[in-house]
Amino acid sequence: DLLERIRHAAHEAHAAVNQFYGVDLPYSYHLDGVAELVARYGGEVCTRAEDVPAVMFGAWFHDSIEDARLTYNDVRKRARSLGLDEAQAFTAAEIVYALTNEKGRTRAERAGVKYYEGIRATPYAPMVKLADRIANVRFSLRQASDYNHRMARVYREEWPHFLASLWPATDDPRMGLPQEMVLQLCELLGVDGKGMFED
């Protein structure tokens, strides 16, 4: 099964660099959380069946350039080797590249204006980034460590800027944010999402 091959390859890429999520969870925990959200809500923005493998690849591999020492070309080749066609591999690699943080000394430098411009310009990247944030917020809220409590506060403080930075500037559904995902993140952060999608 194509999706299972993609999932397994993403897990292996992060395991190969001994990356963990939190203190002791395998990084696959986070990757699966992001992919599960994309699979559940992606139909709202994924308008073509042939894009599904690329979007799911993007979800599972979204941190692979940043954390697993892969290059853009590595990602594209990996997608092809797993069974995506050339167009799908390009779409997948573009999502992963868009979600790769910039070089920077601070969080603000690593995810600045240019970073979010790249996400907004890349089909399906806004949704995958939103899924990534939801997965990270969920995890932070469930953990007892000071670090995770601090990150939960950071995510809450960043919320207005984060949403504004992801909000689509086009009617292209591929750049959209599934309404249910946005409202889910609002609920997790304890912020009011009423009226957000009203004309």
Can you say where each PLM-predicted feature lies in the sequence?
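Active-site helical microenvironments for divalent-metal-assisted chemistry
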Residues: 1-199
